[in-house]
Amino acid sequence: MKTKTDFLKMKEQGEPITMLTAYDYPSAKLAEEAEVDMILVGDSLGMVVLGYDSTVPVTVEDMIHHTKAVRRGAKETFIVTDMPFMSYHVSLQETMVNARRIVQESGAHALKVEGAGEVISTIQYLTNAGIPVVAHLGLTPQSVGVLGGYKVQGKDAESAKKLIEDAKKCEEAGAIALVLECVPMQLAELISEQLTIPTIGIGAGQKVDGQVLVYHDLISYGVNRVPKFVKQYTSVQEEIVRGISQYVTEVKTRQFPEEKHSFTMKEEECLVLYGGKQ
């Protein structure tokens, strides 16, 4: 399993880091088989697999539950778990309780938190306690209401400079990596050059140290539309619908199950069962 040291070395050597979200045992198992470097159990699971309109309703218990499943499916892959909405915007003591629960109960190797400002002290606090932290800047979904929607961040020089400053503060606080979401590629490149920790981009162009995509977006599974930054490498959704539709048809027309899908009794047992009448 790769560790923080390996990811730093990959950045130094110019080897891109691959990160993929996974929310359950089968997706984690497949991600590990595909040799993904890092798995993110994102609170995006609220929208992707739980059907919420945002990530806000996701709880600490949800994150623990899903991370445990991912851990069972990917025992040899570094796993990062999101701290959900309002689980770390409380006192540092309450934040530690939530962080401890997620790490101890789920088996996550690191936690991810969004934003800067007061979150910087949280990064430092968790790091000092021995919990690796991944920072997240740019479009931060938990704050989408404050940001005015799902929009690209850092498009003007002033806001771009603020993001650069925040990125440096995250590194200084002890973050082991930084996710940059929906920022101009020029800004992402500049931030990547000025940090010693790896940057993982999602909608941040190619000049970052790694990329992350949502599993379901990448394979077109259960999604109707995807953001501009997503490349769909295959479409399992069409095959799944086709297969289920065929199943429905065959059941309705009594083509399924066939004899090869059924179990039988010996003829003499049937005679006993039917009282000698068939």
Swiss-Prot record:
InterPro entries on file: Pantoate_hydroxy_MeTrfase, Pyrv/PenolPyrv_kinase-like_dom, Pyrv_kinase-like_dom_sf
Pathway: Cofactor biosynthesis; (R)-pantothenate biosynthesis; (R)-pantoate from 3-methyl-2-oxobutanoate: step 1/2
GO CC terms: cytoplasm
EC number: 2.1.2.11
Cofactor(s) in the UniProt record: Mg(2+)
Protein name per its UniProtKB record: 3-methyl-2-oxobutanoate hydroxymethyltransferase
Record-stated family: Belongs to the PanB family.
Subcellular location: Cytoplasm
Record's function text: Catalyzes the reversible reaction in which hydroxymethyl group from 5,10-methylenetetrahydrofolate is transferred onto alpha-ketoisovalerate to form ketopantoate.
Residues bound to 3-methyl-2-oxobutanoate: 43-44, 82, 112
PANTHER family linked to this entry: 3-METHYL-2-OXOBUTANOATE HYDROXYMETHYLTRANSFERASE
Keywords: Cytoplasm, Magnesium, Metal-binding, Pantothenate biosynthesis, Transferase
Assembly: Homodecamer; pentamer of dimers.
Active site residues per record: 181 (proton acceptor)
Pfam families in alphabetical order: Pantoate_transf
Catalytic activity: 3-methyl-2-oxobutanoate + (6R)-5,10-methylene-5,6,7,8-tetrahydrofolate + H2O = 2-dehydropantoate + (6S)-5,6,7,8-tetrahydrofolate
Cofactor note: Binds 1 Mg(2+) ion per subunit.
